[in-house]
Amino acid sequence: MGKNEWQGAVQPMALRPERQQVAAPCYRKKDDRKQVLLITSRDTGRWIIPKGWPMEDRSDAKAALQEAWEEAGVTGRLTARKPIGHYRYLKLLKDGSTVPVETDVYPVKVKGLATKYPEAGQRKRKWVSPKKAAEMVQEPQLKELLLSL
């Protein structure tokens, strides 16, 4: 990679400030086996866990729980008030650019799934084993977190 390519493409991205998000890996036990709920992203259709931006009126943990409701219709309870870990990814913005995001992870034990919720019809939901979930997501740090659930 030449100097001009670095200055034009890579350097601005590398120097961009990170943004912070919160995520909620949602899980349940079925037949004595743990399952993780994955959802599709609205823009690319790739498999992810519910996540979003922090909320001024809520703790980060409660914001993660709110995202689980809005994006996946999850009702449940937080199993940690502090993040169990973090993962990084590049968020695709509406203008086509990307921004690095660090995501704090707050697990949610699922009590139920609603059929009517804010983003119903915009995403697919799928229950899978933690191992399968780790295979389906792209972010290496998230893969590790899912395997540790």
Give the label of every model feature segment.
Residues 1-31:
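Acidic, metal-coordinating catalytic segment for phosphate/diphosphate chemistry
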Residues 17-19, 46, 125, 134:
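A residue-level structural signature of the nucleotidyltransferase/glycosyltransferase Rossmann-like core
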Residues 20, 35, 98-106, 124:
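Short beta-strand micro-motifs in enzyme catalytic cores
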Residues 32-75:
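Conserved Nudix-box catalytic region and its N-terminal flanking loop in Nudix hydrolases
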Residues 48, 100, 127:
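Short aromatic/basic micro-patch
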Residues 73-114:
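Active-site segment of metal-dependent pyrophosphate-handling enzymes
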Residues 103-147:
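NUDIX/MutT-family hydrolases
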